UniProtKB/Swiss-Prot annotation:
InterPro entries: Aldolase_TIM (IPR013785), ThiamineP_synth_sf (IPR036206), ThiamineP_synth_TenI (IPR022998), TMP_synthase (IPR034291). Pathway: Cofactor biosynthesis; thiamine diphosphate biosynthesis; thiamine phosphate from 4-amino-2-methyl-5-diphosphomethylpyrimidine and 4-methyl-5-(2-phosphoethyl)-thiazole: step 1/1. Keywords: Magnesium, Metal-binding, Thiamine biosynthesis, Transferase. Its EC number is 2.5.1.3. Mg(2+) binds at residues 72, 91. This is Thiamine-phosphate synthase. Binds 1 Mg(2+) ion per subunit. It holds the Pfam family TMP-TENI. Belongs to the thiamine-phosphate synthase family. 4-amino-2-methyl-5-(diphosphooxymethyl)pyrimidine binds at residues 39-41, 71, 110, 139. One of its GO terms (biological process) is thiamine diphosphate biosynthetic process. The lineage of its organism: Bacteria, Pseudomonadati, Pseudomonadota, Alphaproteobacteria, Hyphomicrobiales. It comes from the Bacteria.
Length: 211
């Protein structure tokens, strides 16, 4: 079994949005503001560069007890000793990923709607990322927005922990949590914020207030 993890405020990094401030500076500020789990997502980075980024983030986050998740790349997660991997629908199957990762690492899966959930291989999956809740500009291949109601529809089908993701701002958090999400995953609301620490603090407060 993976170690316990907290999905309250799930930060997904975007290399373009953190370029000016720096990846480590942005993530450090977000964690100080209350981010509870961090996913490294950089689809354009080559393997070696991604491993280096992951190791730097692991060194930052491990002493704080914050899990580091790697988007898509099981090999990078193993090489950097990250805490887990998040898979999309077109990535390696969860069963194959689990076979490589072993039982201790966290495994997440993206789900776009109830039909996609029903068709998914959930072997070894520990949590779901459900969305996009709203239209998003940070992921070109994201499907159509499903709204908080879509999150609720997936929640009705599963007991797995889940986060709502996709275009979420602080004002959207309450609806997503009340629909049954355990937390929210955000990209630009923190990565593009002028003050990532304060942005994270406001988002986390909104999650806790809606529970």
């Amino acid at each position: 079994m993976p170690k316990p993890f907290d999905l309250t405020l799930y930060l997904v990094t975007d290399p373009r949005l953190v370029a000016a401030r720096g990846l480590l500076t942005t993530v450090d500020a977000a964690v100080k503001g209350g981010a509870t789990i961090v996913q490294l997502r950089d689809p354009d980075a080559h393997g070696r560069a991604l491993v280096e980024q992951a190791r730097a983030l692991k060194a930052l986050l491990a002493p704080l007890g914050i899990p580091l998740i790697i988007n898509d790349r099981v090999d990078v997660a193993v090489a950097a000793d990250a805490d887990g991997v998040h898979l999309g629908q077109d990535d390696m199957t969860p069963a194959d990923a689990r076979a490589v990762l072993g039982p201790q690492r966290i495994l997440g899966l993206s789900v776009g709607n109830p039909a996609e959930y029903a068709a998914s291989d959930l072997s070894g999956v520990d949590y779901l990322g459900v969305g996009p809740v709203k239209a998003t500009g940070t992921k070109a291949d994201a499907g159509g927005a499903i709204g908080a109601a879509g999150v609720g529809a997936v929640r009705a089908l599963t007991r797995l922990p889940l986060v709502g993701i996709g275009g979420l701002a602080t004002a959207d958090v309450a609806d997503v949590i009340r629909a049954g999400a355990d937390g929210v995953a955000v990209v630009s609301s923190i990565c593009a914020a002028s003050d990532p620490e304060q942005a994270a603090r406001a988002l986390k407060a909104a999650v806790l207030a809606a529970r």
